Amino acid sequence: MQNKETVTRLANALSTELAADDAQKMAELINAALKSENVYTEQLPLSEEDKHDCLLMAFEERILIPVRSTQTGSWEDRILRFTPGEMFFMPHVARLLFENAAETGTLDSEAAVRSVLSHHPEKQVEQSVKFLKEMRFHFRSCMAEGGLMSAVAQGTGITVDVHDIVDTCVVAGIMSPCTRGSTMQGLAWYEFHPCLYWDQNFK
């Protein structure tokens, strides 16, 4: 019963962003992934067809990241395969977001960010939250270039070095470098975790 209730609460939280059927399936996937640090394809309690669709969505939304990668540790360099034995992990901030959702039935991105950054000075936490909220109005497809991020930080009165905020957010699973965009354009691009912005109050 407890497991069923947990899935129901997760599905309720996800329903603000996903259709009811997708929210239910994704809730089952997330619930399975929350039980251990890593999860294997065969541990996901879905039909093969649903598993394929949900894994694809989970990767696109950065809920689950394949352990297998090409060159760097960035999210976009990961290799998604659907074969048995493939291992996935959940970024730290996403794990905190969905652990809380499993208990409350709602998404609280600010609480997840504050929790994952709790070992940092209070000023950095406060300004990181402010920066992440403001960026939702400036990035495209949850991606932004470093110069834009610096301009946004300056424009919103953030005094903590934006490079320190970015470095901290990368370690916490809040952001990831975009290696392909950086290589092609000669600029530093970063991806923000999409699920944080499913919470409409995170702004």
Q: Can you say where each PLM-predicted feature lies in the sequence?
A:
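Short amphipathic alpha-helical interaction segments
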Residues: 45-67, 155-172
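Alpha-helical oligomerization segments
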Residues: 167, 171-203
